[in-house]
Amino acid sequence: MGKKDASSVKLPVDQYRKQIGKQDYKKTKPVLRATRLKAEAKRSAPGIRDIILVIVAVLLFLLGVYAFFYLNLSTELDLDVDMD
């Protein structure tokens, strides 16, 4: 008999979940589809942080190439001046 009485009392968490489930059923298919697509786009979109890191890496590479050529050309020019 104790089991019968215990099953009639529901936890507040279970009642809350049941209410949320009812609210979810009230949504129409286009709303649910839009919500799902928005969540997928948020998960799969590249972050601004990733884009900034790529741009910084490219700029550092270009700076390194520029510095390499600048140093090589400046030493060649110095040698030409010394030979005169």
Swiss-Prot record:
Membrane topology recorded in Swiss-Prot or TrEMBL: Single-pass membrane protein
InterPro entries named among the record's database cross-references: TRIQK
Membrane-spanning residues: 51-71
Localization per record: Endoplasmic reticulum membrane
Cysteine disulfide links: none
GO CC, one annotated term: endoplasmic reticulum membrane
Main location: endoplasmic reticulum
Pfam family, one: TRIQK
Keywords for this protein: Endoplasmic reticulum, Membrane, Transmembrane, Transmembrane helix
Physiological role: May play a role in cell growth and maintenance of cell morphology.
Family to which the UniProt record says this protein belongs: Belongs to the TRIQK family.
Protein name: Triple QxxK/R motif-containing protein
